[in-house]
Amino acid sequence: MSIILGIDPGSRITGYGVIRIVAGKAEYLGSGCIRTDFGELPSRLKQVYDGVSEIITQFKPDEFAIERVFMARNADSALKLGQARGSAIVAAVNALLPVSEYSATQIKQAVVGTGGAAKEQVQHMVTHLLKLSATPQADAADALGVAICHFHTRQSLIKMAGRATSSVRGRYR
């Protein structure tokens, strides 16, 4: 059994999603958003750090996954997003969690089956995959998608490692 914390970073709203892996299946533990005030950026970054640290204390995850920064049209927005992302990563590293990073395309591919999926499609599939009674808000759904992507990626790597050990001279046994 392991617990995965997924983060969808933002300088105003940072989504989080927590899943537990039991017998090869993902179970929903919690999700939500860390909303920062409209203060100066350093204050908002501290709020992201403190919020992620609090979630780590509450859920005690074993693994941490976060969305990579994409190139935004607005360079200032991309820089702020990167700084918020860094605040979340520092919280994970301080808690001695392994950190994995995924692009938006990888996350959408893992959750919906296509890298070009819309936010609504991600919300729908997260709701379906985790058997939720209500659709989570967009940022929380994206964070749950990050956690699901990490779970699927980890499962694929485990399967590939198993195949590699059963291979002799290029043949599978």
Curated annotation (Swiss-Prot):
Cofactor(s) in the UniProt record: Mg(2+)
Function: The RuvA-RuvB-RuvC complex processes Holliday junction (HJ) DNA during genetic recombination and DNA repair. Endonuclease that resolves HJ intermediates. Cleaves cruciform DNA by making single-stranded nicks across the HJ at symmetrical positions within the homologous arms, yielding a 5'-phosphate and a 3'-hydroxyl group; requires a central core of homology in the junction. The consensus cleavage sequence is 5'-(A/T)TT(C/G)-3'. Cleavage occurs on the 3'-side of the TT dinucleotide at the point of strand exchange.
Subcellular location: Cytoplasm
Top enzyme class: hydrolase
Residues that hold Mg(2+) 2 according to the record: E67
HAMAP family: RuvC
Residue numbers binding Mg(2+) 1: D8, D139
This protein's GO CC annotations: cytoplasm; Holliday junction resolvase complex
Cofactor binding summary note: Binds 2 Mg(2+) ion per subunit.
PROSITE patterns found in the cross-reference section: RUVC
Active site: D8, E67, D139
Catalytic activity: Endonucleolytic cleavage at a junction such as a reciprocal single-stranded crossover between two homologous DNA duplexes (Holliday junction)
Superkingdom as given in the UniProt entry: Bacteria
Pfam families: RuvC
PANTHER family given in the database record: CROSSOVER JUNCTION ENDODEOXYRIBONUCLEASE RUVC (PTHR30194:SF3)
Designated name of the protein: Crossover junction endodeoxyribonuclease RuvC
GO MF, any single term: DNA binding
UniProt entry keywords in alphabetical sequence: Cytoplasm, DNA damage, DNA recombination, DNA repair, DNA-binding, Endonuclease, Hydrolase, Magnesium, Metal-binding, Nuclease
Subunit (UniProt): Homodimer which binds Holliday junction (HJ) DNA. The HJ becomes 2-fold symmetrical on binding to RuvC with unstacked arms; it has a different conformation from HJ DNA in complex with RuvA. In the full resolvosome a probable DNA-RuvA(4)-RuvB(12)-RuvC(2) complex forms which resolves the HJ.
InterPro entries named among the record's database cross-references: RNaseH-like_sf, RNaseH_sf, X-over_junc_endoDNase_Mg_BS, X-over_junc_endoDNase_RuvC
Enzyme Commission number(s): 3.1.21.10
Lineage: Bacteria, Pseudomonadati, Pseudomonadota, Gammaproteobacteria, Aeromonadales
Main localization category: cytoplasm
Biological process annotations from GO: DNA recombination; DNA repair
Family classification: Belongs to the RuvC family.
